[in-house]
Design a protein with these regions (language model features):
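Glycine-rich, often proline-containing surface loops adjacent to acidic residues and nearby aromatics
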Residues: 33-35, 85-93, 169-177, 206-207
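Short, amphipathic alpha-helical interaction segments positioned at domain boundaries
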Residues: 80-107
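Hydrophobic, Leu/Ile/Phe/Ala-enriched alpha-helical segments that form helix-helix packing faces
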Residues: 27, 43, 55-59, 112-120, ...
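Short flexible/disordered coil segments
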Residues: 63, 91-92, 128-145, 195-203, ...
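Exposed, interaction-prone assembly regions rather than primary DNA-binding/catalytic cores
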Residues: 97-188
């Protein structure tokens, strides 16, 4: 990713090396938070003096703070207004404190950007909008809600959007991402796709990357993307529902050998609660209208899956700050350190929106 030399020079003037300056620029611009592992991967270095020197510089100049979630692991936050102002990013909200849900999402987004640093990434929602409208000629009124209650098309900071100039296509490919940092089902992902369908349909070509630490939902996400955005796969899904109904009703004589094989493969393909919900609606002739191929679809796109290792080594399986809930000897529970906010579990709806 190209970075202006004057901005790197400003960071070097604080005493940071070239590699440290590039890393800190990416963190400040796209995340605000980072871990030692991310820096070491970026610097292609082993744990030791390299990361120790970086952290010492950050602390000595008041550019960062650290929050410990497990005994030997920290998340570092670039919060210094002076550092952000120095690179012309004083307006970014990354320097502010955030809840844990936001932090985990930003760390995964940074994982993606560091792994694909050859791409160019937009730093603000305004920059994303300008590229779509001014360069790709997307009608600007597409970002307004429609009379039918369609939500605003959003370009959230937590989902990196970039441009790949290494594409085999004649024109650069715009890249959208969805960072699934919570794994509470695909309900939020489906809402995100529905909200942005009009935008995707207006593009000549685009790539979409589903970033996740859990592989169990990735194939299901690919099927959902094909149905809602690419307008394909509905015929197979409806055929599966029809055969499943006959099988469940013990009408085995109505199934050919090929149909039994298709049904068996469909059971492996259509897993997950969302397909159970769609089957429930199909039996009542209430399938969502946006599954129809004549809707806002664009088959001229590429869907990709990316599995990142995540940050369980930092947060553990239960996210809380190290020391939360400890009792001070001789004190009451009321005097113990306050408990940290926890992730609120979301429930996947049993019915899709009709």
């Amino acid at each position: 990713m190209p970075i202006a030399q004057d901005q790197l020079a400003t960071l070097r003037s604080f005493g940071y090396t070239e590699v440290e300056s590039r890393f800190l620029y990416l963190v400040a611009t796209h995340s605000g938070y980072f871990t030692v592992r991310q820096f070491l991967d970026f610097a292609n270095a082993k744990s030791g003096k390299r990361n120790a020197h970086l952290i010492a510089k950050l602390f000595s100049q008041g550019h960062a703070t650290a929050q410990r979630y497990r005994r030997r692991s920290c998340v570092y936050h670039l919060h210094s207004r002076a550092l952000y102002d120095a690179i012309g990013k004083g307006e970014l909200r990354n320097r502010r404190n955030h809840e844990i849900r936001h932090i985990t999402a930003r760390l995964l987004a940074l994982d993606y950007i560091l792994a694909h640093s050859e791409n160019e990434y937009f730093e603000t929602a305004r920059a994303k909008w300008r590229y779509l409208v001014e360069t790709l000629k997307v009608p600007d009124d597409i970002f307004l809600p429609e009379a039918d209650g369609t939500e605003w098309i959003a370009l959230p900071d937590r989902f990196p959007m970039g441009v790949s100039r290494a594409s085999a296509r004649s024109a650069p490919a715009v890249i959208f991402t969805y960072v699934d940092s919570e794994h509470f089902g695909l309900g939020p992902f489906i809402r995100h796709l529905r909200m942005n369908r009009r935008l995707y349909a207006a593009l000549p070509y685009f790539e979409f990357v589903y970033v996740s630490t859990a592989s169990r939902e990735q194939e299901e996400a690919a099927e959902i993307f094909a149905l809602l955005i690419q307008g394909r796969g509905l015929e197979d899904l409806l055929r599966y529902f029809d055969l499943k109904t006959k099988w469940d009703n013990r009408q085995y004589g109505l199934l050919s050998e090929d149909e039994v094989i298709f049904l068996s493969e469909g059971r492996k393909r259509y897993t997950g609660e969302i397909f159970a919900a769609l089957y429930y609606l199909w039996k009542r002739n209430q399938l969502p209208k946006d599954l129809r191929a004549e809707g806002f679809c664009n088959s001229n796109c590429a869907f990709k899956l990316m599995t990142v290792c995540g940050h369980d080594a930092v947060f553990g399986t239960e996210i809380k700050r190290w020391g939360d809930g400890w009792k001070v000897r001789g004190s009451s529970r009321a005097n113990s350190p306050p408990r940290s906010p926890r992730l609120e579990q979301q429930v996947l709806p049993t019915k899709a929106n009709a």
